[in-house]
């Protein structure tokens, strides 16, 4: 799942999700049922017949997430998927992602330059240095998830401390390498 939604503009929401599961569901009816199930899981059931240009950015991103999850991956790679979204939509999408993560119990590799987003979403943060790319540090996030066992409290003192540590690691790795 990438920053740009990469949806086929000539396909409906349902058809975009169906596209990724053709091999798993050769029967078009079964493929359609599976696609509708995923569209429903991301909260877009009533928009299944809509086209991407009829959806908001957050809705388009949910379609992209449904399409990525429909084949049943064990690992979901997300490269700055919420970077282009406004703050409110980003917060909703983060919540949706956490709900999906809990429901499916899959590994999510989430790439972001937003430190707060990293601390909110991650159980473990890997800090990479540029040129050449290498692992600088691994930072386990031990801040409890309070709201429904999903969300972290941004105003908890530990949250600020982790942000400070993470910021320091980034400054150190950038200064040393570029």
Task: Annotate the PLM regions.
Residues 90-104:
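Helical segment within the ABC ATPase nucleotide-binding domain
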Residues 3-8, 114:
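Catalytic "switch" loops of ABC-type ATPases
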Residues 105-111:
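Conserved H-loop
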Residues 65:
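Hydrophobic anchor residue at the start of the ABC signature
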Residues 18, 29-47, 99:
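Conserved ABC ATPase "signature" region
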Residues 76-79:
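Catalytic Walker B motif of ABC-type/P-loop ATPase nucleotide-binding domains
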Residues 50-53, 71:
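Conserved signature/switch motifs of ABC ATPase nucleotide-binding domains
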Residues 2, 14-22, 32, 140:
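Short helical segment in ABC ATPase nucleotide-binding domains corresponding to the A-loop/adjacent helical element
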């Amino acid at each position: 799942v990438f920053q740009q939604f990469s949806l086929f503009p000539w396909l409906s929401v349902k058809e975009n999700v169906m596209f990724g599961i053709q091999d798993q569901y050769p029967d078009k009816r079964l493929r359609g049922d599976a696609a509708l199930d995923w569209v429903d899981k991301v909260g877009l059931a009533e928009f299944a017949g809509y086209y991407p240009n009829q959806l908001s950015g957050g809705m388009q991103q949910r379609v992209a997430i449904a399409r990525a999850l429909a084949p049943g991956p064990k690992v979901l790679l997300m490269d700055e998927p919420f970077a282009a979204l406004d703050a409110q939509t980003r917060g909703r999408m983060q919540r949706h992602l956490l709900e999906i993560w809990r429901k499916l119990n899959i590994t999510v590799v989430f790439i972001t330059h937003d430190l707060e987003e990293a601390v909110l979403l991650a159980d473990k943060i890997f800090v990479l240095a540029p040129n050449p790319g290498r692992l600088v540090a691994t930072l386990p996030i031990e801040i409890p998830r309070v709201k429904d066992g999903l969300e972290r409290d941004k105003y908890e003192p530990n949250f600020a401390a982790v942000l400070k540590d993470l910021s320091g690691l980034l400054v150190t790795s950038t200064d040393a390498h570029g």
